[in-house]
């Protein structure tokens, strides 16, 4: 196992679990933080969430173990149909920003952020073109604040 494009890291409140967002595999790994080798897909780790609707980046973990993830780009059916594996998808996500815009632009109804329970259950999805591609996020009380690519104003959604 391994990660084809780690793009976000977040540590659980107890310090025992490191969450890793994987661009190439469109998943979130839960990796034991105390291990000698911290490899997603390796011994003792598990997928918290897989088959995500976009390419995950920003991660945040709340005290209760809820994991929030922001999607920088929408899933590209063309790329995934033509890429032989997660490594090539990870490489494509490192293209120039203008090329990425053309390949992965967020659709009007695209999901740009989600929240998962500690067990991996989907708790909520947030979307819409107005929100765009999320590059940073921060849950606080009854909101999730979102840093959106190309925007000067911080967006937020109610939890």
Outline where the language-model segments fall:
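A short, polar/proline- and glycine-enriched secondary-structure boundary/capping micro-motif
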Residues: 9-10, 30-32, 41, 79-81, ...
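Blade-edge beta-strand/turn elements of extracellular beta-propeller
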Residues: 1-8, 29-52, 118-129
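Short, solvent-exposed loop/turn segments that connect beta-strands within catalytic domains
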Residues: 16-17, 36-42, 139, 146-147
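Beta-rich, blade/repeat-based domains predominating
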Residues: 1-17, 51-64, 109-112, 129-142
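Structural signal for beta-propeller blades
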Residues: 26-28, 75-77, 113, 152-155
């Amino acid at each position: 196992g391994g990660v084809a494009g780690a793009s976000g890291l977040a540590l659980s409140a107890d310090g025992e679990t490191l969450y890793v967002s994987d661009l190439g595999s469109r998943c979130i790994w839960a990796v034991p933080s105390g291990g000698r080798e911290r490899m997603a897909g390796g011994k003792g780790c598990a997928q918290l969430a897989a088959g995500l609707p976009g390419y995950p980046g920003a991660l945040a973990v709340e005290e209760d173990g809820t994991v929030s993830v922001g999607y920088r780009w929408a899933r590209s059916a063309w790329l995934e149909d033509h890429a032989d594996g997660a490594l090539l998808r990870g490489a494509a996500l490192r293209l120039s920003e203008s090329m990425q815009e053309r390949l992965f632009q967020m659709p009007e109804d695209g999901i740009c952020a989600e929240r998962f329970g500690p067990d991996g259950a989907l708790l909520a999805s947030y979307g819409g073109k107005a929100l765009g591609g999320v590059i940073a996020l921060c849950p606080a009380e009854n909101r999730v604040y979102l840093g959106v690519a190309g925007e000067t104003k911080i967006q937020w959604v109610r939890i």
